[in-house]
Amino acid sequence: MPLLVDRPMHSFATVGGATCLTSATNLNTPSGGGCILLVDCSANDGGVIDSLSIIANEATTTASNVIVFLSTATTTSTISTANTVAVAIGGIGSTNMGERTNIALPPLSVPVPNLGGDTTVSETDKKNTGLYVPSGALVYVGVDVVLTAPSATTVAHVFAQGGFF
């Protein structure tokens, strides 16, 4: 059965000024100071993100990862390891202005039509990908390394597309 959405979702966040982790080598250390709200489902029936993209705004942007967090924290000041988990990650390694990087998302329980009986494709290939955001949850994004090149004001944009239930 397909996921039915009430209205489309198109949201963006600007990242790069602060790191979203307290430890650069541990995804289980979210820092509210570097997390930026991307999607808010705290007061609706939830949603699904079917596409996440990173846009590098400047040539030779600092190499960094954009980390996507699913959280029940309604403000960045209340983000902690108890209420926030990393669910996706994508890299910024731009040498070209405007370069887009799509963040890989996990398979959903939504089948792709006409692939059910095909034994030549994997079980994962038979499902659409996306990120289900339950009612009461929020999606935050941030970078693991502050974007300092080519300038101290360098930022990247993260776009989410999908729908709200």
Named regions from a protein language model:
Residues 1-165:
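Surface-exposed, low-hydrophobicity beta-strand/loop segments enriched in small/polar/acidic residues
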